[in-house]
Amino acid sequence: MSFLDSVLKAFVGDKSKKDVKEIQPIVNKIKALESEFEALSLDELRAKTSEFKAKIAEATKEVEDKIVALNKEADEIDDITRKEDIYAEVDALKEKSYEISEAVLNDILPEAFATVKETAKRFVNNTQLKVKASSFDREISAEKDYVTLEDDHAIWSNSWDAAGKPVTWDMVHYDVQLIGGVAMHQGKIAEMQTGEGKTLVATLPMYLNALTGNGVHLVTVNDYLAKRDSAWMAPIFQFHGMSVDCVDYHRPNSAARRKAYNADITYGTNNEFGFDYLRDNMSHAPDDLVQRPHNYAIVDEVDSVLVDDARTPLIISGPVPKGDTHEFMELKPAIANIVEVQRKHLVKVLSEAKKLIKEGDTKEGGFQLLRVYRGLPKNKALIKFLSEEGIKQLLQKTENHYMQDNNREMPKVDAELYFTIEEKSNQIDLTDKGIEFLSGKDEPDFFVMPEIGMEIAKIEKEGFPAEEEAEKKEELFRDYSVKSERIHTLRQLLKSYTLFEKDTEYVVIDNKVKIVDEQTGRIMEGRRYSDGLHQAIEAKENVKIEDATQTFATVTLQNYFRMYGKLSGMTGTAVTEAGELWEIYKLDVVEIPTNRPIARNDKEDLVYKTKREKYNAVIDHVTDLSNAGRPVLIGTTSVEISELLSRMLKLRNVPHNVLNAKRHKQEADIVAEAGNSGIVTIATNMAGRGTDIKLSKEVKEAGGLAIVGTERHDSRRVDRQLRGRAGRQGDPGSSQFYVSLEDNLMRLFGSERIAKLMDRMGLEEGEVIQHSMISKSIERAQKKVEENNFGVRKRLLEYDDVMNAQREVIYKRRYHALFGERLRVDLANMIFDISESITETNKAAEDFKNFEFELIRNFSMSSPVSEEEFKKMNAQKLAGEVYKSAYKHYDEKMSHNAERAFPVIKQVHEDERNNFERISVPFTDGTKTLSVVTNLEKAYETEGKQLIKDFEKNITLAIIDDAWKTHLRKMDELKQSVQLAVHEQKDPLLIYKFEAFELFKVMLENVNRDVMSFLFKGEIPSTGAPSIHEARQTKSKEKVETRKEEIPNMDERAAQSRAAGNTQRQQPEVTETIVRDRPKIGRNDKVTVKNVMSGESKTMKFKQAIPLLDKGDWVLVEE
């Protein structure tokens, strides 16, 4: 604890003690009820649940009844304004109902918690529990073997199978667990040390919040924990008639998964919850939805999910046109060559630098050393040399000298290099020498971007004929886009060769490149690096290069979890991230005291000069511990190190298991053995692992589990997770971290102070230092990294907040269209918006002719006012007249369509040979035709009105989805292009917000116009009955995939743009990929066009047709 912290504690008091003190009275109430609940029979105990539910129902009855009455009224009336008011009132009442039920939950909390605790006690004290059988008992006895029926009784066993592992219930909630349960119900994060039974604590708030019937989600980091915990805890809930399910057992979009979400309590992984939300917002029928509104979630390992995973958005993507065209394999040999040339050159430079420094020429030696560091920072010989006395300081001093005045002198250092590497920001740049080397003598301009502005001016000066000038400009733009893509490909290939190491950042399994999670050491199935980096690594490793994809739907985990009415979490390590959790999620962290004092011995770090010495010391220590009969858990940060230590232990004949990303399938078996005497387990990062390590009596006597950390992690929290695997529930144990000056953390973020300190102490090779001052310096370095990462996540969230606001608007509209109840209100608003837009633009220009034309184009109707009235009226009144007239016209049009369709529907319905459930009816607007599926029975009963409702729903959904996909692509491109704003000393985020708003406004206007245009013009073709046929139930599914993107941080993006700006400074433009939706037509090709108003057709050259097509009243007829 820092000095400042201890001073603050003395004056302000200890936050964790305050938090516990506030909760203690509630815990006392729960304990006071214990004797009363012990006296209850099993049936009386079970009746408590019905009693609680009745209390909630009674309290919310008045509000719920009002909601039902208002919805009924809205269905029966046609007045759009009244409908809108009703829906606003319904939304407000739903909020009120939620608040009332929350107040009731707070009142019944002591009794509800006492019920769960007493249930746990009964399961511990009885092998069988005999109760009067309910219908739920009968239902569950058919599925689960721990419930059997005997006459009209049900017998519950206290032993069952928890995801393949037999368990006998042996847990009752301690007082500290009750405190944790209360904190979680209040929407806070309970920090409980490992082994304090977080899984059991969660049963308390889950039972309480499930009483409302709105669903409770428990979110875990992996499917093993989701499946295990759901099976382990289920009987406690099921005994009280609550249904429990786990989404990871069922296929996406299936009826079984919908049933899992409809259960009272639902377990699952964060990814699946997020992907289901996205899939729901891509569905085309209400029956396809699986999730209910987001009510209450408890996130297990909350820091891992909300902090570590926050930089990785969930993405559903699909194929992009020409997604398989790239130049990775063509450019790969050149990159492999340039990397090798630079490596050979810098090896010589390094030996020259060593020689100069040895001779005392530190100026020139430092200069050469910096050059090597700029070109190959991960070179092993360089890292070893930097651990020698005074060398790290010399490098830092030289770097500071050349970095002053905004890197003014740095080009001197980089002059001999082909490319430079900024390891801290993961950034790489080609130098002029590198570009020259890659271009070769034959094509000097192979990588040089044309200066667009200058080139266009040149073309215009030449005075070419209009057609030729257009061709030349087209060619220039083509050349620009090919070269910018080529430079991007090149950069990503360079990055893959110099910054991404196999078996550290990724592994290759089954000829596929798979990312290793730096936090947990697990393989991230289905995740890909974005921005072409993954394809570059695939090219480097000679495996199949996957096609590029386009985003169809995306959400970050941060914004997904913020949708819940109430969010809480539990973890062993959140205090270090408490500031971030409060700032982003408004989640307070409550430290829960341990049930028994921690008996683990946490030793100060041992610091060595080189990695080699450090690993030798680790192996010596581990061998001694193993011989003493203690189990040892070695934590490593990469697959490569875990395999190196495994080889070293083999040479010493020490029996051991390795648990890393390559062996994740054997995880449960390895962890089960890890607590046995003398067993050594090597694991890559332990977040969420090792929860099942149990120690025998002999092991406890020998000193318990020994934790050996081979390196300090970037985050203090991950180190605490590793430490926490020992000393559970007051067991003995120890933890020891080994550090070397060559470790990444020390190299990148270790201060000059540590280097000076080591030199002052005269650390010789093989010697070790153990001092609290060193440990504090390491912690400071970790804090630096954490602050850096927090900045990145916060920046990312600010970008995503813009998307989130837009996503909410679009998904709300989609939801209304999907269910159709509020769609008429949305459509009326669309008509009003278009009316206002037409009126404002034409009134300002006093252009009555264009006003008439736009009304015909958008609403297929003539002007409701004369030219004289148009000139006299103000814009607001005129817009109102247009809206009234357009809405009346729309209403009549839809009634006419229903009347026209009904005779055919009647004929199909009354023909006894047809036993159709759903029929497909074609609608056309004169150019496009769309088949609308509707329920035949409902269409018949409503005299065709149901068909019109389905027509409105289908058109709105189809147009929104299409526009949203295109918009997402534009937003991706905008995010890339705004980074160039740094050249003009502007904040890219501000420009992004402004441009994104403009893009979204234009998209919404286009959606409104496209939807209304089709609805006003759309009608059933006059061919009649033959065009109506049975709708088959086959769903044509788009080929989509789900993945989590590893995205470069904003610093990287800005650095990339700065590099781009060095070659060319120009206005940041928003680039947009144009995707053709029709074949390319030559200017002199003959085409046929048709007038949508009169139906007249003409054949002419395409260049003559362009002005007509641009006006919008002529369309191209595809032959």
Swiss-Prot record:
Gene behind the chain: secA
Biased segments, Polar residues type: 1059-1070
Subunit structure: Monomer and homodimer. Part of the essential Sec protein translocation apparatus which comprises SecA, SecYEG and auxiliary proteins SecDF. Other proteins may also be involved.
Region (Disordered): 1025-1081
Keyword line: ATP-binding, Cell inner membrane, Cell membrane, Cytoplasm, Membrane, Nucleotide-binding, Protein transport, Translocase, Translocation, Transport
Record bears the keyword Protein transport: yes
Reported function: Part of the Sec protein translocase complex. Interacts with the SecYEG preprotein conducting channel. Has a central role in coupling the hydrolysis of ATP to the transfer of proteins into and across the cell membrane, serving as an ATP-driven molecular motor driving the stepwise translocation of polypeptide chains across the membrane.
Organism: Christiangramia forsetii (strain DSM 17595 / CGMCC 1.15422 / KT0803)
Protein name: Protein translocase subunit SecA
Swiss-Prot/TrEMBL catalytic activity: ATP + H2O + cellular proteinSide 1 = ADP + phosphate + cellular proteinSide 2
InterPro entries reported for this sequence: Helicase_ATP-bd, Helicase_C-like, P-loop_NTPase, SecA, SecA_CS, SecA_DEAD, SecA_motor_DEAD, SecA_preprotein_X-link_dom
Lineage of producing organism: Bacteria, Pseudomonadati, Bacteroidota, Flavobacteriia, Flavobacteriales
The enzyme's E.C. designation: 7.4.2.8
Main location: membrane
